[in-house]
């Protein structure tokens, strides 16, 4: 009888512990635990929702790589990269396979709190883009995705201007490292600037 009560007590304790265990939360990492790209069945990208926990690279204000209409308001661009790729860049001066660079666009504000001049970033996200390096998957090794909902990144056609622009002007491996102040010196030290970028700089 005593043994039966012990078994029942152990069973109840196990049940309580199981119910108290935290529910696993959704993660943007893949099954291996790395921040590598994960794709949907139709070839799009599962947007890395926790990208703001990645490495911050740079910000720009009202940047444009060609003539465009005045939007009537200012915009901030923030760039983040997955930690694995960042660490590899520091060692080699270039991006490894499975690199993901996220460009986040936010509205700029000028009137708020005690601010009297200049601009600050608002909470309104206007757009998200992801530049993915997947050598086995994409022609040219890189691809662009855009995400309106922050859930799915839609693959952009290789015919779009962003591909040729990055190939012709990117300082390192089709990426605009020339605008990443903490990485520009690394690329210079490792001698990884593209021929196109060096030619462009020499012509200034």
Task: Please identify what each model-predicted range represents.
Residues 1-4:
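Positively charged n-region of N-terminal signal peptides that target proteins for export
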Residues 9-20:
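Bacterial N-terminal signal peptides
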Residues 18-20, 44, 177:
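Generic N-terminal simple sequence motifs
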Residues 18-30:
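Bacterial Sec-dependent signal peptides at the C-terminal "C-region" and cleavage site
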Residues 27-31, 37-40, 47-55, 59-64, ...:
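Sequence context surrounding c-type heme c attachment/ligation sites in exported
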Residues 66-68:
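Acidic, aliphatic-rich amphipathic alpha-helical segments
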Residues 74-86:
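Short, structured beta-strand/loop micro-motifs enriched in basic residues and often containing a Trp
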């Amino acid at each position: 009888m005593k043994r039966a009560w012990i078994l029942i007590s152990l069973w109840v304790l196990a049940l309580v512990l199981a119910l108290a265990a935290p529910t696993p939360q959704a993660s943007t990492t893949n099954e291996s635990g790395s921040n590598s790209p994960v794709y949907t069945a139709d070839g799009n990208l599962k947007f890395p929702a926790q990208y703001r926990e990645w490495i911050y690279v740079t910000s720009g204000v009202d940047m444009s790589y060609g003539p465009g209409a005045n939007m009537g308001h200012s915009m901030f661009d923030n760039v983040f990269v997955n930690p694995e790729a960042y660490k590899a860049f520091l060692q080699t001066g270039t991006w490894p396979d499975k690199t993901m660079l996220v460009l986040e666009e936010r509205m700029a504000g000028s009137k708020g709190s005690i601010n009297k001049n200049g601009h600050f970033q608002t909470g309104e996200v206007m757009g998200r883009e992801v530049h993915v390096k997947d050598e086995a998957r994409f022609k040219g090794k890189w691809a662009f995705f855009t995400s309106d909902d922050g859930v799915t990144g839609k693959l952009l056609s290789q015919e779009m201007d962003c591909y040729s622009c990055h190939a012709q002007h990117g300082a390192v491996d089709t990426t605009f490292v020339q605008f990443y102040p903490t990485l520009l010196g690394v690329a210079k030290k490792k001698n990884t600037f593209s021929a196109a970028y060096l030619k462009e700089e020499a012509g200034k």
